[in-house]
A protein has these predicted regions:
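Short linear motifs centered on Gly/Pro in flexible linkers and helix caps
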Residues: 1-5, 29, 98
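Charge-rich, low-complexity N-terminal segments
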Residues: 1-16
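A generic structural signal for ordered secondary structure
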Residues: 8, 12, 37-40, 56, ...
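N-terminal regions of proteins, emphasizing targeting and processing segments when present
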Residues: 15, 48-52, 60, 76, ...
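Short, surface-exposed loop motifs enriched in S/T, G, D/E and P with embedded aromatic residues
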Residues: 17-22
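Amphipathic, interaction-prone secondary-structure segments
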Residues: 23-71
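Ampiphathic alpha-helical segments that act as solvent-exposed interaction surfaces
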Residues: 69-115
Length: 115
């Protein structure tokens, strides 16, 4: 998984975390795949909506249903389009030139696991 430093620093700023370490995949209640990140005392998910559209938010695991998570903050969005990456938080959009986020290989692995 690739997250360019400028986007990574903005994510850390938005969520007020110092660490952002990918640890595993999970599922949201609608069965969307999620990438789970350890951020010290917090857990953040990047939920796959489509190949170019993602939700990002703080999350907690549902211990009654291991592997499934729920949002504990409002959803923010990552959009990759027209050779730009956009992070939308609280109605404000920050645009990063080029592809600042790429999880293509992880999406391929998830698709292979499903088949």
């Amino acid at each position: 998984m690739y997250i360019r430093d400028d986007l990574l620093n903005k994510i850390k700023e938005v969520f007020n975390v110092k660490e952002f370490t990918y640890i595993r995949t999970g599922k949201y209640y609608n069965n969307n795949d999620m990438f789970i990140f350890d951020c010290g005392n917090e857990t953040i998910a990047i939920e796959v909506e489509t190949a170019n559209f993602f939700s990002i938010y703080k999350t907690k695991e549902n211990f009654d249903h291991p592997g499934y998570f729920y949002a504990v903050t409002q959803k923010n969005f990552l959009l990759i389009k027209d050779n730009k990456t956009r992070l939308r938080v609280d109605g404000e959009t920050t645009t990063f030139p080029g592809n600042a986020f790429d999880c293509t290989s992880e999406l391929v692995l998830l698709a292979m696991e499903k088949s």
